[in-house]
Amino acid sequence: MKKISYVVVLISLTHYASASSEINFSPDSVSVDASLSVLNGKSSEFVYNDGDKLSQLDWKIQNTPIVKAGITWDAISWLTLNASGWTTLASAGALMDDYDWLEPEQHHWSEWSHHPATRLNFANQFDLNMTGWFLKDENYQLGAMLGYQETRFSWGATGGHYSYNNGNITGDFPRGQKVIGYQQKFSAPYLGLAGKYIYRDFDIIAQFKYSPWAEGKDTDQHYLRDITFKEKVINQKYYSAVINVGYNITPQARVFTEMSWSRTSNDIGDSTYYDNAEGEVEKMKDSAGMQNYNYTIGAGIQYRF
């Protein structure tokens, strides 16, 4: 009798594993979503010498409209694949402040320039991930995520005013004069957790992502001096959280509001200096740093075929 029970259990488990691993090609296994959001945040770049900070440039993002889109495939009962991204719709107003510490033993900056006519030229992101659901019920789901993400930002600062030599030299840059251009790119393979709770026609989706392997690259173009810095930082820490609250207006259509937050923390990396006029190149170890945080708030619609 015991042998028969074991055989029945084994057959049942084998059948469940086979069924649960069957690839789902039905149309209702695929959903698409689109939303409009507002992006805010700040990127910073740093210059170091023997561990001392010489320069910090803060590039702010202010209420920039973006469009988000994504496609999701419930490929297997326990596995979901997703591709998503967002991009700015057009260039937008931004802000840049440039601080330098040129006086030895002085903790407060000695040089500062302010550029209210800065523009965010573009920003975008793409994200590829998969979620394996280890808890799945009619009202809740919990899973582990594995993914890869890239995020890019580009700014240009023109005009503005300056205060040098501890305020002894002040003035204005000509209106419209190109001062500094800056591009930043972060890439990160990541791990994460995903969860979903369903109550009648409402649901809440939450995601948390983490990576200790983020990599930052940037290009800093100083137009007035005709010099360029290119920097690279590895093994940065990346954190991200998303909350999505939705309502199913039909079995196929869902409207939602969403808030996301992400941060890539500063770390020390290397820099390459280019004197474009003289053709000189110099590589500098442990001389650069960069970081970014940003958040979005928006609303959209999801459709399941």
Stretches with model-predicted labels:
Residues K2-V9:
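Sec-dependent signal peptide recognition
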Residues S18-A34, D201:
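Outer-membrane beta-barrel biogenesis signature
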Residues G41-T64, T87-F126, E150-F186, S211-V242, ...:
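Extracellular/periplasm-exposed beta-strand and loop segments of Gram-negative cell-envelope proteins
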Residues V32-N40, A83-L89, G132, A144-R152, ...:
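Transmembrane beta-barrel strands of outer-membrane/channel proteins
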Residues A69-W73, F126-G132, L146-Y148, L191-Y197, ...:
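Residues on the lipid-exposed face of transmembrane beta-strands in outer-membrane beta-barrel proteins
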